[in-house]
Design a protein with these regions (language model features):
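Mature catalytic domains of secreted/periplasmic carbohydrate-active enzymes
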Residues: 1, 5-6, 10-151, 159, ...
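Trp- and acidic/polar-enriched beta-sheet ligand-binding modules for extracellular glycan
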Residues: 149-155, 164-165, 176-197
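An aromatic-rich alpha-helical recognition segment common to small helix-rich domains
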Residues: 170-171, 187
Length: 197
């Protein structure tokens, strides 16, 4: 589906799968958990106020903060982001446009380069077995993952950190090759080990 908002704000996270059959067209805008085709939504936006280059817009290029917000509300909600860079009269991308994009990339890399859970102890209430243990979430291996038992839809996963940390962003990924299976989650924390917030 196309996120048809020029503001590029995706208001929800949808399944990225659909049924590849004409009679299921209504699932195009939300996705279908039992879908058999991987079709993520596409969020299109221009780095400038319009889709084509106008010199008078050189001072109105989206700020790095605006681009970060767009990234979080598109890619962060399971959508592909198509960011338009209109070439100027020389056929080149304007230096302000490319600088803001480079700074966005730097911010993304800095935000997600450090796994704050590295060194944490992890346990789960529902584990399929040693091959799918919760420690697999922290091993940095793309071919390993945590899984709960078949037929059980809930698992509490608890990370115990060696020290208190502060963060303002969280990335949770699932093994998309197995389909979009996570439908609901929540994050809670405790400082004293007793009271969860």
């Amino acid at each position: 589906s196309l996120v048809g908002s020029e503001m590029c704000i995706r208001d929800r996270t949808d399944s990225v799968a659909i049924r590849d059959e004409a009679q299921y067209y209504k699932g195009l805008n939300e996705g279908m958990l039992d879908g058999d085709a991987y079709i993520p939504a596409e969020t299109d936006v221009s780095i400038r106020p319009s889709w084509f280059y106008h010199a008078e817009e050189d001072s109105r290029v989206k700020s790095v903060r605006e681009l970060w917000d767009i990234y979080c509300t598109s890619v962060g909600r399971n959508s592909v982001l198509l960011l338009n860079f209109p070439p100027d009269r020389r056929g080149l991308i304007h230096s302000t446009d490319s600088l803001h994009a480079a700074l966005l990339k730097q911010g993304i890399d800095e935000t997600f380069s450090t796994n704050l859970l590295r060194g944490a102890k992890v346990k789960a209430t529902n584990v399929r077995g040693a091959k799918y243990s919760p420690e697999k979430m922290l091993d940095n291996e793309k071919n390993t993952y945590f899984a709960g038992k078949d037929g059980e839809v809930k698992a509490d996963i608890i990370f115990t950190l060696p020290k208190t940390i502060e963060f303002d962003c969280l990335m949770i990924e699932e093994v998309i090759e197995l389909g979009h299976r996570t439908t609901k989650w929540s994050v809670e924390y405790t400082v004293d080990g007793k009271n969860w917030i």
